[in-house]
Amino acid sequence: MLKRIFSYMKQYKKYAYLALVCIGIEVVLELMVPMLMADLIDYGVAYADIPYIYTKGIQMGGCAILALILGIGSSKFSALAGQGLGANIRMAEYEKLQSYSFSNIDHFRVSSLVTRLTSDVTNIQNSVSITGMRPFGRSPVMLIVATSVAFSINSTLALVFLVALPILAAMLIAIIVHIRPLYTKMQTAIDLLNRTVGENLTAIRVVKAYVRGDYELEKFEEVNDNLKKQSEKAFKSAVLNMPAMQLVMYSTILGILLLGGQLVKLGELGIGQLTSFLSYVLIILNSLMMMSNVFLMMTRSLASGARIMEVLDEKIDITDELARDISVERGEIEFDHVNFKYKEEAEEYVLSDISFHIEPGQTVGIIGQTGSAKTTLVQLIPRLYDVNEGVVKIDGVDVKEYPMRHLRDAIAMVLQKNTLFSGSLLSNLRWGSEDATMEEIEEACHIACVDEFIDRLSDGYDTEMGQGGVNVSGGQKQRICIARAILKKPRVLILDDSTSAVDTATEAKIREGLAKKLPDMTKIVIAQRISSVRHADLIIILDKGRINGMGTHESLLADNRIYQEIYESQKEGAEL
């Protein structure tokens, strides 16, 4: 997995290599200082040789200055490498998400995807940038060089800290094995916190309207406490690393002082050599502590890396594998014995044995009770989901044979949940066509009756919509979305209950405008109100995922029980 993660460093690898080179030279210079100090004490101070003291002092100062410059360089290069790696991983994840089908997205919670794009990437990033690269590069070099020098000073004394190495290794392995699953749980707790915050902010108006602020506060307190507890469990285990290392380190130093003192007394070791040896032992033990911290950081990064790889390794179930270089020309639609379920392991189909035919330019209404899979049915046309059995055809060709870009360019959907983006009204309309002229935009707005209220907006087409279009009503938002879809100039237009917030008079104008101005466009209208579909060329009745009846308003009113019941209930409610 590490190899895959670091493959995203790409053009930033040179900065990582430069950082490691700077770190390596910096460490060598730092390790020269104790050797120079030993010579200064044993040959300069001991014999009062002032010129020798000055010479060694200048050499030590030069090493320190060069090490400082290289330290700054390594910090800069490692930061560039870490930030670049993080940016590339985020981009790779985001690109992968754009290729997800609806069923792929259903495998993850939105809050979890946000965490995997932010917090998890930051953990990987930190393991490469200053906080990770420097100790990762410094510790092995310091350990190898300092150990070699320590043995060259006195091999007998060096055996003391060799005893400590297996103890330190065993302690570190035990901590890592225990802490890795705790880091995974902590990241999952962050997912839950993000989900709670996201839901609250998205539905803040509902929360206020139902006076549920206290309930939401309690819910947040619960997930916040859960994150705190999971974090405490992880970090309680992590902090054991430092005192355990220090215990072994101080015990080792004490042993070296006892044995070294005896060697000095016997004349087998100079005071400067003992001082230098202790300096190298401290360097060795500090390098081991740094390595242990690096391992802990890598453990957390690996937990995050595994979550990131789940996003990148998600198998895309809707591809262009069977696609040919063709485009939708007419908008003829055919469902041929289609069966569909969201999950392969599900026992029952959501849609069963669906068959119907729509001629180019026809207007087709789809009506049925809530939960009858009306939306699911139309989502099969642009391949937001793929059928399990049967075939969906456009212009006599299986939709799987169209390149997805060409297929979806030819189909415009106005979904149940109307989405507007931050920006001006004009920029939202141009989502339908970036190159649309103002004349085309005004024409689309006229058909969708947007022109009826646009003059009342503070800045007309330049009015800022706010996040999600908060400064326009539900009906106005629906009309804007319809205009946006018209600007796409599709061969097939799907309106999924997208006039539910529009009054019947305005809805009639929109219907008339679509019929007169866009007669060749195939139109599919999902609706709850019979008034929205009664003028359609064909009306399809769905019931529990099956077609219960098809025909015109008059024929269904004459012989379809479900249609009659809907008609009578709405007639009583004065909707017709």
Description of each model-found segment:
Residues 25-29, 33, 61, 66-82, ...:
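Hydrophobic alpha-helical membrane-associated segments
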Residues 21, 29-33, 70, 118-164, ...:
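Hydrophobic alpha-helical transmembrane segments of ABC transporter permease domains
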Residues 49, 148-163, 176, 233-306, ...:
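Helix-loop-helix
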Residues 1-11, 113, 117:
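A short amphipathic helical element positioned immediately N-terminal to and/or at the very start
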Residues 326-576:
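ABC-type nucleotide-binding domain
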Residues 10, 16-73, 77, 151-156, ...:
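Transmembrane helix-loop-helix hairpins at lipid-water interfaces of multipass membrane proteins
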Residues 11-14, 99-103, 119-136, 140, ...:
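An intracellular "coupling" helix at the cytosolic face of ABC transporter transmembrane type-1 domains
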Residues 47-48, 83, 91-115, 119-121, ...:
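Short intracellular "coupling" helices and adjacent cytoplasmic loop segments at the cytosolic face
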